[in-house]
Amino acid sequence: MTTALDQLKQYTTVVADTGDFQQLAQYKPQDATTNPSLILKAVQKDAYKPILEKTVRDHRNESTDFIIDRLLIAFGTEILKLIPGRVSTEVDARLSFDTQRSIDKGRELIKLYEAAGVGRERILIKLASTWEGIRAAEVLQKEGIKCNMTLLFSLVQAAACAEAGAQLISPFVGRIYDWYKKQAGAEWNEARDGGANDPGVQSVRRIYTYYKTFGYKTEVMGASFRTTSQITELAGCDLLTISPDLLQKLQESNETVARKLSPETLQDKPAERVAIDEASFRFQLNDEAMATEKLAEGIRVFAADAVKLEKLIDALR
């Protein structure tokens, strides 16, 4: 019997969302994604502490920022030994509102990868989908540095990323779901409000339809899943990045997975493109409470984890 994971791979590029690269082999993903929280989680495990310790030891007299960059590259290069495709490495969330420093950091990370013998075609630089982050991606893409736009919760963010020529976007299914479920409180009914009606699933479906309708080349990679049903409802999406826990559940399941998204079967096509000059972008984002709150929260969480990682490094000096 074919597993749900194998069936999903027929329609969608499967990506592993983890810093725990020892788990990669069993799921055979094409690509992998990391973020500050996942790297922080990984370096606190016994299996990965030596990577952190060696990176600090080798660069003891350098700045903490310098060491973190080398740590990200150390994880990225190890991950790339285990997958055929690309790894996503994230720019410090504290640069989310600074276009020039985001550009500089993206260039620096690519230089470090290239110095380690990794070609830029195998790297995606992750940037927050703020106005400033999107402008940084626009510059980097023109230099041949591919960008993965993260912390994306709305169609206006997706539209702006596509217009900027971003390689890929990561709409956060689970965090959208979390927000609506919390807002509904006792009124939430999983049978009624989950599955195809899941607000996170619907958001990705709307973005996918928008991109395919207007012929954008930017890849759509659903991210931040809470359940396997959120994943299977998006079978056919360009890519889906999935945690090891959910990859395991898909591998253990023989549930039939049918294709749900396809450029040939688009429904509810938009009539016109979204206006995405800066004023329109900021107003539309502000007008969507969920997207505004989740973007702000996501930046705070990633920034806080970057600070925790700095403290771990400083304690080892």
Curated annotation (Swiss-Prot):
Pathway membership: Carbohydrate degradation; pentose phosphate pathway; D-glyceraldehyde 3-phosphate and beta-D-fructose 6-phosphate from D-ribose 5-phosphate and D-xylulose 5-phosphate (non-oxidative stage): step 2/3
Biological process according to GO: carbohydrate metabolic process; pentose-phosphate shunt
Role description: Transaldolase is important for the balance of metabolites in the pentose-phosphate pathway.
Record's protein name: Transaldolase
Record-level Gene Ontology MF annotations: transaldolase activity
Entry annotated with the keyword Ribonucleoprotein: no
The organism's place on the tree of life at top rank: Bacteria
Top-tier EC class: transferase
Reactions accelerated catalytically: D-sedoheptulose 7-phosphate + D-glyceraldehyde 3-phosphate = D-erythrose 4-phosphate + beta-D-fructose 6-phosphate
Family, similarity comment: Belongs to the transaldolase family. Type 1 subfamily.
Gene Ontology CC terms: cytoplasm
EC number: 2.2.1.2
Pfam family name, one: TAL_FSA
PROSITE patterns to which the protein is assigned, alphabetical: TRANSALDOLASE_1 (PS01054), TRANSALDOLASE_2 (PS00958)
Intracellular or extracellular location(s): Cytoplasm
Subunit structure: Homodimer.
HAMAP family in UniProt: Transaldolase_1 (MF_00492)
InterPro entries: Aldolase_TIM, TAL/FSA, Transaldolase_1, Transaldolase_AS
Entry keyword set: Cytoplasm, Pentose shunt, Schiff base, Transferase
Organism: Burkholderia orbicola (strain MC0-3)
Primary location class: cytoplasm
Residues the record marks as active site: K126
